[in-house]
Amino acid sequence: MPRFIDRVVVHARAGNGGNGCASVHREKFKPLGGPDGGNGGRGGSVVFVVDPQVHTLLDFHFHPHVVAPSGKQGAGSNRDGAAGADLEVKVPDGTVVLDERGQILADLIGAGTRFEAAAGGRGGLGNAALASRARKAPGFALLGEQGEVRELTLELKTVADVGLVGFPSAGKSSLVSTISAAKPKIADYPFTTLAPNLGVVSAGEHTFTVADVPGLIPGASEGRGLGLDFLRHIERCAVLVHVVDCATLEPGRDPISDIEALEAEIAAYTPTLQGDSTLGDLAERPRAVVLNKIDVPEARELADFVREDVETRFGWPVFEISTVAREGLRPLIFALWDMVAAYRAAQPAAVPRRPVIRPIPVDETAFSVVPDGQGGFVVKGTRPQRWVAQTNFDNDEAVGYLGDRLARLGVEDELLKLGARPGCAVTIGDMTFDWEPQTPAGVDVHLSGRGTDVRLEQTDRVGADERKAARKARRQSDDGEE
């Protein structure tokens, strides 16, 4: 029997963007072809997709690292690099995605539902895209951005119409195996069921699903027994059924005290989803009580004795059954279907889910410069850190281009205001370098274009009119000599 895993930590790494290409067009009779380096391809993203054929998170338990392919590098002749393919990861229906802080990022319900877990990095620009009027032939290109890396927690919350709750060895697994084709493990010791068991039940021409939740004990909401590991599986159930063992010989236990103890644990449990929007609050779900094991004479007497008290105290329908003798099962099945159908009809129609984009406001032009306490400075900001990550520091021209961009952003002016001196250490992102101002303090910054092809600036080239005038002058001189 495959292991049931309903909570895992996944390390998702999106693909990096491809590097841009620094290339010059070469063709016969075109000495000044200009830059033609293509851009790098976008990195692949990690996408979770709901697959109804997947029922557990077992694959992530053994393979927690998910890595998407990176984009390809750009090439000459204005050829852009190929984008990395998105990695689609199949997850079961009912998976909840949480971030490192425990905040819910997505609640994946319904076949085909998608969620981008980690975004791929953007490709670097080639020198053709970097060319401008002031920089006609850049000798460098930008590196691709790093893909997003995230540590996510996946929780599986069983999607079922009816949830069976009760003390250990109350007969929940036996009931599921009797009214459906499910074959859970059944034994005569507590906590035999270590994972929820799903079964499909037929009520005439109608069907509904039943989930057998592992046994609960007082203190489960605080982690006792199997605790919170399986309480979350009742969050999506439309109907909750208390399965009570009327044949138990444990002192201090009776059907009413068992129901009250379990209701206290359910009330103390705080759902992660704060109630499914299509089902309402957990405390408002309809309930039923099943008095089990009436094939035992003493259990039948107890069930007959407490049935009226249970109905009066809680106001829920009560059923007496025996899974061994298969007694009382048919009325229970049709009654559960009526409860499920009535509850579905009473709920408002589910609004079709529409993609909602909630962009996080980011001021990319903002940056801050703070002293590091050792005579250096640390520059923080979205743009400066991204620019540094995209710079090839082995290329002097690329470093100069980075300096121009930082100066335009105002980083150099801010360093001068804080008293930075030439040669002091400046840290941006993961890079620390010795800072040298482009101009002395107090002098306006005049930026010069970098990457200019000197051949384009030549003024001694002879034009057609000049050659024509030279030929005319030579003919006149030849005629004069004759």
UniProtKB/Swiss-Prot annotation:
Pfam families: DUF1967 (PF09269), GTP1_OBG (PF01018), MMR_HSR1 (PF01926)
Domain OBG-type G: from-to ranges: 160-341
GO MF annotation, one: GTPase activity
Binding site for GTP: 166-173, 191-195, 212-215, 292-295, 322-324
Compartment(s): Cytoplasm
EC number: 3.6.5.-
Keywords tagged on the record: Cytoplasm, GTP-binding, Hydrolase, Magnesium, Metal-binding, Nucleotide-binding
Domain of life: Bacteria
Region Disordered, annotated ranges: 450-482
Domain Obg: residue ranges: 2-159
Comp. bias (Basic and acidic residues): 452-468
Main location: cytoplasm
Record InterPro entries: G_OBG (IPR031167), GTP-bd (IPR006073), GTP-bd_Obg/CgtA (IPR014100), GTP-bd_prot_GTP1/OBG_C_sf (IPR036346), GTP1-OBG_CS (IPR006074), GTP1_OBG_dom (IPR006169), GTP1_OBG_dom_sf (IPR036726), OBG_GTPase (IPR045086)
Gene Ontology CC terms: cytoplasm
Function: An essential GTPase which binds GTP, GDP and possibly (p)ppGpp with moderate affinity, with high nucleotide exchange rates and a fairly low GTP hydrolysis rate. Plays a role in control of the cell cycle, stress response, ribosome biogenesis and in those bacteria that undergo differentiation, in morphogenesis control.
Listed HAMAP family: GTPase_Obg
Self-association and partners: Monomer.
Family designation: Belongs to the TRAFAC class OBG-HflX-like GTPase superfamily. OBG GTPase family.
Name recorded for this polypeptide: GTPase Obg
Native source organism of the sequence: Mycolicibacterium gilvum (strain PYR-GCK)
This protein's encoding gene: obg
